[in-house]
Amino acid sequence: MINLRKTHPLMKIVNDAFIDLPAPSNISAWWNFGSLLGICLVLQILTGLFLAMHYISDTMMAFSSVAHICRDVNYGWLIRNMHANGASMFFMCLYLHIGRGIYYGSYLYKETWNIGVILLFAIMATAFVGYVLPWGQMSFWGATVITNLLSAIPYIGTTLVEWIWGGFSVDKATLTRFFAFHFILPFVILALVIVHLLFLHETGSNNPSGINPDSDKIPFHPYYTIKDILGLLLMILALLLLAMFSPDTLGDPDNFSPANPLNTPPHIKPEWYFLFAYAILRSIPNKLGGVLALLASILILLIFPLLHTSNQRSLMFRPISQTLFWILTGDLFILTWIGGQPVEQPYIIIGQTASILYFMTIIILMPLAGMIENYMLKPKW
């Protein structure tokens, strides 16, 4: 009998990607985050779809419609809390996924890595426009501050900002288009994810040792399907605990007040997952400089393959580079903390120091460490 799974045009694609896929035998739990991100995306699209059925993208109605979802819609509170905290879960998995890629040298699969960076930008854009939709104080002022950054672009800046706003301030037109963007972007992300997987399956997965694993491969199913299901259960458990017991922990109290253009909140800050970039933006006392630093802090990921100087792919056997990696991780935690603090001393100088360290570690120290390790491993006889 012909195995339909291996011959049917559609099932063959699924089979080659999730069942008979040859996978390295030694990939650790750090390789779970790719599948978890896929689950997060599906979860966000589904909860978002149900929210969109009840949400009204009008400045007079948006805030009330979100309150209506939480109070009057069947399990609306759960759908809304799962969606809001699902975004936090998404970014947690995303940052761990990127960290794994940096630690184990996965960025040397250049096409997969570059598509991943584009995905990061698309997800950040989606999260930003989504945060504006409840039309609370922080939604409104966050939208005003972040879109205003585009006015730093010489010559066309002001025109560009007014074009994005659809008027002379953040208003009804802005909210309506942000809702449209927030609805369409996840499907763009879905398409990019397929391309990301396509390029990954051209080369096969990397592994912790960084050595070519072709001589020792195992089928994806059942070994990694069961491992992914364990990861999924743990993530869903964490998400449900967060969404049911403390759904507002990661949110901003200011967003419980309806948007008021006449009253500015004392501290305007984005959600926790943007704070590191916000701290880098604020550390430069110049609008254009800050915007460029903000962009550079994420675009720098694109040059990781060019900055790789080591003869070894992974950091598994490279103690100096490992130390620098964990310094970079700690630095990102410091930047995240600083991004949530007011602009006053000592936070200003800490933020500036952490920003300099961030760029210096990636551009100078890590390539240098790779070269030193190469020299140390050279036979001296």
From Swiss-Prot:
The keyword Lipid metabolism does not apply. It is found in: Mitochondrion inner membrane. The chain crosses the membrane at residues 33-53, 77-98, 113-133, 178-198, 226-246, 288-308, 320-340, 347-367. CDD domains: cytochrome_b_C, Cytochrome_b_N. GO terms for biological process: mitochondrial electron transport, ubiquinol to cytochrome c. GO terms for cellular component: mitochondrial inner membrane; respiratory chain complex III. Its cofactor is heme b. It comes from the Eukaryota. Heme b b566 binds at H97, H196. Keywords: Electron transport, Heme, Iron, Membrane, Metal-binding, Mitochondrion, Mitochondrion inner membrane, Respiratory chain, Transmembrane, Transmembrane helix, Transport, Ubiquinone. Binds 2 heme b groups non-covalently. InterPro entries: Cyt_b/b6_C, Cyt_b/b6_C_sf, Cyt_b/b6_N, Cytb/b6-like_sf, Cytochrome_b, Cytochrome_b_C_euk/bac, Cytochrome_b_N_euk/bac, Di-haem_cyt_TM. It is a multi-pass membrane protein. A ubiquinone binds at H201. GO terms for molecular function: metal ion binding; ubiquinol-cytochrome-c reductase activity. Heme b b562 binds at H83, H182. The keyword Glycoprotein does not apply. Heme 1 (or BL or b562) is low-potential and absorbs at about 562 nm, and heme 2 (or BH or b566) is high-potential and absorbs at about 566 nm. Component of the ubiquinol-cytochrome c reductase complex (complex III or cytochrome b-c1 complex) that is part of the mitochondrial respiratory chain. The b-c1 complex mediates electron transfer from ubiquinol to cytochrome c. Contributes to the generation of a proton gradient across the mitochondrial membrane that is then used for ATP synthesis. Belongs to the cytochrome b family. The cytochrome bc1 complex contains 11 subunits: 3 respiratory subunits (MT-CYB, CYC1 and UQCRFS1), 2 core proteins (UQCRC1 and UQCRC2) and 6 low-molecular weight proteins (UQCRH/QCR6, UQCRB/QCR7, UQCRQ/QCR8, UQCR10/QCR9, UQCR11/QCR10 and a cleavage product of UQCRFS1). This cytochrome bc1 complex then forms a dimer. This is Cytochrome b.
